[in-house]
From Swiss-Prot:
The keyword S-adenosyl-L-methionine does not apply. This is DNA ligase. It holds the Pfam family HHH_2. Keywords: DNA damage, DNA repair, DNA replication, Ligase, Magnesium, Manganese, Metal-binding, NAD, Zinc. One of its GO terms (cellular component) is cytosol. Gene3D superfamilies: 5' to 3' exonuclease, C-terminal subdomain, 6.20.10.30, BRCT domain, DNA ligase/mRNA capping enzyme, Helix hairpin bin, Nucleic acid-binding proteins. The keyword Cell membrane does not apply. It catalyses: NAD(+) + (deoxyribonucleotide)n-3'-hydroxyl + 5'-phospho-(deoxyribonucleotide)m = (deoxyribonucleotide)n+m + AMP + beta-nicotinamide D-nucleotide. Its cofactor is Mg(2+); Mn(2+). It comes from the Bacteria.
Length: 841
């Protein structure tokens, strides 16, 4: 073998080891992941070609090797002892006092402090600077040999740095799984349908105990060193770090770092109990932002001679203490599983728990995230579960203790109705989240419904901001969006006065200016009636504002010199103005899931009438271009809810007027065929070709309903398709849907004008894109005028784009249009074209 090959292999090992050191120990990588992979592959190829190059400390050994049948038990040369625990400040102060009294020192005691890593304790043995063995802590006396798995951890050095390396060195530390590595591993496992890791600690322990080290090599493990065991320097064996190497624990950690071991950057040296407790506080506050899990901090007397003097008791050192954080995981029992409805309608399952202390608080509820998560965990009422809480994160059910499950438990099923409003709970195919379909009426969604309803692109109620919407809803003054049209100036002024008052007394002082004496006395009596002690001897109820509004207020005679009323008058005027609207805006304002402005515009253009749209079976919506099954079903779910229909009735009763009602577009005529309906019903196995075949043979839904599969087969329909259709029609809900859709299709055809009656615009059917800044009009105004001429205004350029309107500072869209040969219009040409066709500014 050539000397150059040997030198190249040596150089590759050196560079890879240095890269590992800079990445894991210094957090300062100097090469990219791709460059690292290239070096690693080159070394592997050399060692495969020349097996005699392979050494025990080669980085290539980290990929794992042969499968073991079992782990060998190994007795520790020096026992791996446990630490005494402290859970409060008194125990920490007692710990310091005991050392102080025993040492008899007049100087402040110094301690080396570090996080208590939540992983698996390990002992690493090096001989002549090379890694030879890794052993788990086990029971402290005997552990298991996991050397092959340890070799796969890139942050564990296989060969030590420096010239003063002991002949034998045992290093104690913690193998852990970083949080981001844990998350990524579980994402990949979920995608492959594999079992998820319960938490990073279990992930680290399970990874090290894999009999196949190739599996360990795929796990994102890392390592921190925090102590030493047996050391041999020259011919002398030491059971602790010798004075010649270090005289303090912190100096020993610095030496370990110099030899190439990763040591936490959070290690510090502090003085006395105040220093210990301040460190505990700092680490506790930083805990949730750390890249790894910890469950406390560890205090060690820094002076090694002092450690020797303090000694041990009951297999624990007197000179060290673990100050534990309150547990972030505990087990408890699921007493019920209920549904919470969020402001956007998302239905989140929540476990009601037997109360348990987790991370310093009593937890009685924990999120289960969604129905899929419940199915993955198989959480059932009565189960014993592991509850996790980290910092301010909402407590969650992390795992089920399956072997403690009581008999006769049942799998949980998502309810079919919203627990708040009774509307149907639905989930679109492929979505994780179930939603309440009572968008307009569900109290849980009320604020979001109002915010959307009054927004600029919906009903455009100018001056009604988010904070005042909260006041309106929280006060109970408005129960549904139609209640906006019942508001008065008096109500708005009273609401603001109450909502901004710091106390009932402050409200009374301000209200006095606007009330006659009799009305003022009535207001005082009302406050007393809702539990407010005007003498100030009892605590004011937190809900006094809402309670007062519900109880009713006397008539105010507003002193306009003392209060501004113009804002309220303007808001009422804006509400009145919004009564006159378009069908497009009204549909968008309803807040139907998946129905944005463009879909609302298409529905308005193609159907033209609210009464028609709100009673249309969902498959017929699919005849509108760009409306697919998901949007169509969402429309159907919305209009199927009695509460939503009642909310629309209330809006119309409050004189909300749609001014652009028109007959359905004649373009629908060619779409309203039985073949299309059969396709749009989404019947399994009924393809467009089969739908056309069935429509030709039978002519109506009624002809298909009662014959079963035989007539279909006789008409040439394949047996499997015939059986699928017949089975589908046997479901009452499907049968009703098909019949209603057929009836509505016929009614639509009857009310539709002939094709020649429809007016078309000069841009009918053309797609236009606008980019850059226009000087004479806004992008929205340009879009509206182009759409009025029949154009579809899109957000991206494609081969189907008819032309691009390019304003100032046009960017990548202009470049793409030019590359595709799309016609380019400047603003002057656009304005001229709009003027020619009656769309002047």
């Amino acid at each position: 073998m050539e000397q150059g090959v040997i030198e190249r292999a040596r150089e590759l090992r050196r560079r890879i080891e240095n890269a590992d050191h800079r990445y894991y120990d210094l957090a300062d990588p100097e090469i990219t992941d791709a460059q690292y992979d290239q070096l690693f592959r080159e070394l592997q190829e050399l060692e495969q070609k020349y097996p005699e190059l392979v050494t025990a400390d080669s980085p290539s050994m980290r990929v794992g090797g042969a499968v073991r049948k079992s782990f060998v038990k190994v007795r520790h040369s020096i026992p791996m002892l446990s630490l005494a625990n402290a859970f409060d400040e008194v125990e920490v102060k007692n710990f310091v006092d005991r050392i102080f009294r025993r040492m008899g020192s007049s100087n402040p005691l110094e301690f080396s402090v570090e996080p208590k890593f939540d992983g698996l304790a390990i002992s690493l043995r090096y001989e002549l600077g090379k890694f030879v063995q890794g052993v788990t802590r086990g029971d402290g006396d005997v552990g298991e040999d996991v050397s092959e798995n340890i070799r796969t951890i890139r942050s564990v050095p296989l060969k030590l740095k420096g010239n003063n390396v002991p002949a034998i060195l045992e290093v104690r530390g913690e193998v852990y799984m970083p949080r981001d590595g844990f998350s990524e591993f579980n994402k990949r496992a979920m995608a492959r349908g594999e079992k998820l890791l319960a938490n990073p600690r279990n992930g680290a322990a399970g990874s090290l105990r894999q009999l196949d080290s190739r599996i360990s090599a795929q796990r994102p493990l890392s390592f921190f060193a925090y102590g030493v065991g047996l050391i041999q320097v020259e011919q002398d064996l030491f059971e602790e770090i010798p004075q010649s190497i270090a005289s303090t624990h912190s100096a020993m950690l610095a030496q370990l770092r110099a030899w190439g071991f990763p040591v936490s950057s959070l290690v510090e040296v502090v003085q006395g109990s105040d220093g210990l407790l301040a460190y505990y506080q700092r680490i506790g506050e930083a805990r949730d932002g750390l890249p790894f899990d910890i469950d406390g901090v560890v205090y060690k007397l820094d002076d090694l001679a002092g450690q020797r003097e303090m000694g041990f008791v009951s297999r624990a050192p007197r000179w060290a203490l673990a100050h534990k954080f309150p547990a972030q995981e505990q087990s408890t029992t699921v007493e019920a599983i209920e549904i919470q409805i969020g402001r956007t309608g998302a239905a989140t399952p929540v476990a009601r728990l037997k109360p348990v202390h987790v991370a310093g608080v009593i937890v009685t509820n924990a999120t289960l995230h969604n129905a899929d998560q419940i199915a993955r965990l198989d959480v059932r009422v009565g189960d014993t579960v592991i509850v996790r809480r980290a910092g301010d994160v909402i407590p969650e059910v992390a795992a089920v203790v399956a072997d403690q499950r009581p008999p006769a438990t049942q799998s949980w099923q998502m309810p079919t109705q919203c627990p708040v409003c009774g509307s149907e709970i639905v989930r679109e195919e492929g979505q994780a989240v179930w939603r309440c379909s009572g968008e307009l009426t569900c109290p849980a969604q009320r604020k979001e419904a109002f915010r959307h309803f009054v927004s600029r692109r919906a009903m455009d109620v100018d001056g009604l901001g988010e904070k005042f919407i909260e006041v309106l809803v929280d006060s109970g003054v408005v129960q549904g969006v139609a209640d906006l049209y019942l508001l008065t100036v008096d109500q708005l002024l009273q609401l603001r006065m109450i909502s901004t008052a710091e106390s009932p007394h402050a409200f009374l002082r301000e209200a006095r200016e606007h009330l006659a004496s009799g009305a003022y006395a009535q207001l005082e009596a009302t406050l007393v009636g809702i539990g407010v002690d005007l003498a100030g001897e009892r605590e004011v109820p937190q809900t006094w504002q809402a309670d007062l509004l519900r109880a009713g207020l006397p008539t105010f005679d507003w002193n306009r010199k003392k209060i501004a009323t113009k804002w309220a008058e303007n808001l009422i005027e804006a509400i009145e103005t919004s009564r006159d609207t378009t069908l497009e805006r009204f549909l968008f304002a309803l807040g139907i899931e998946h129905v944005g402005e463009s879909t609302a515009k298409a529905l308005s253009a193609w159907f033209g009438d609210l009464d028609l749209i709100r009673h249309l079976p969902w498959p017929l919506f699919k005849r509108v271009p760009d409306i697919g099954g998901e949007v169509a079903r969402s429309l159907g779910h919305f209009f199927d809810q009695p509460g939503n229909q009642k909310a629309i009735d209330h809006l119309l009763a409050r004189k909300v007027r749609i001014g652009d009602t028109h007959p359905p577009s004649p373009k629908l005529r060619g779409e309203l065929r039985l073949a299309n309906l059969l396709e749009d019903l989404e019947i399994p196995k009924v393809t467009p070709i089969r739908a056309a075949q069935i429509a030709t043979a039978f002519g109506s839904i009624d002809a298909l309903r009662n014959g079963g599969p035989e007539p279909l087969v006789e008409a040439g329909v394949p047996q499997s398709v015939a059986e699928s259709l017949a089975t589908w029609l046997l479901v009452p809900a499907n049968d009703t849907l098909a019949v209603n859709a057929q009836k509505k299709l016929s009614a639509l055809l009857a009310m539709m004008p002939e094709a020649g009656e429809e007016k078309t615009g000069p841009l009918d059917g053309q797609t236009v894109v606008i980019t850059g800044t226009l000087a004479a009009l806004t992008r929205d105004a340009a879009k509206q005028r182009l759409e009025a001429l029949g154009a579809k205004v899109a957000g991206s350029v494609s081969k189907k784009t008819a032309f691009l309107v390019a304003g100032e500072e046009a960017g990548s869209k202009l470049d793409k249009a030019q590359s595709l040969g799309v016609e380019i219009w400047d603003e002057a040409r656009l304005l001229a074209f709009l003027g020619e066709h009656g769309q002047q500014r």
